Swiss-Prot record:
Transmembrane segments: none annotated. InterPro entries: Ribosome_maturation_RimP, RimP_C, RimP_C_sf, RimP_N, RimP_N_sf. GO terms for cellular component: cytosol. Belongs to the RimP family. Keywords: Cytoplasm, Ribosome biogenesis. It comes from the Bacteria. The lineage of its organism: Bacteria, Pseudomonadati, Pseudomonadota, Betaproteobacteria, Rhodocyclales. Its main location: cytoplasm. One of its GO terms (biological process) is translation. This is Ribosome maturation factor RimP. Pfam families: DUF150_C, RimP_N. The keyword Cytoplasm applies. It is found in: Cytoplasm. CDD domains: YlxS_C.
Length: 146
């Protein structure tokens, strides 16, 4: 079983959402970002400890070698990767970087309008744009401090 499948199965099985995974260049440090959409208060230390303990056991059983495992909440500027996330966070401010420039630009920031027919809608200061979902390299929410 590959690492992403192993992580997804374990994290979802514990009742959390797997947001993102980062690995150090040599694969010795694994950073796992989790969320609990049903929980109003977000991820806390107990959630991270629960996932960490379970993943440590799973890695031992699966004979997956690592030096350090870090579990964290996705933070206010969370990564937006999955198609469902582009719907879930509709109406929020987002930064998007595309692989292939569109209209001479690779970086966009505006209000997320959602995902429809494989295109992510974005309201910019002057107009609305549609970006191909498959062309998105990175997307992050922009935190609001009201």
């Amino acid at each position: 079983m590959d690492l992403n499948t192993l992580l997804e199965t374990t994290v979802v099985g514990l009742g959390y959402e797997l947001v993102d995974v980062e690995m150090s260049p040599r694969g010795r440090t694994i950073r796992v970002f989790i969320d609990a959409p049903a929980k109003e208060t977000g991820i806390d230390v107990e959630d991270c400890a629960k996932v960490s303990n379970q993943l440590t056991r799973v890695f031992e059983v699966e004979n997956f070698d690592f030096d350090r495992l870090e579990i964290s909440s996705p933070g206010l500027d969370r990564v937006v990767k999955k198609a469902a996330d582009f719907e879930r966070f509709s109406g929020q401010e987002i930064q998007i970087k595309v692989r292939i420039p569109q209209g001479g630009r690779r970086n966009f920031q505006g209000e997320l309008l959602g995902l429809k027919d494989g295109k992510v809608g974005l309201r910019l200061a002057k107009d609305d744009v549609e970006l191909e979902f498959t062309n998105i390299e990175k997307a992050r929410l922009v935190p609001r401090f009201d």
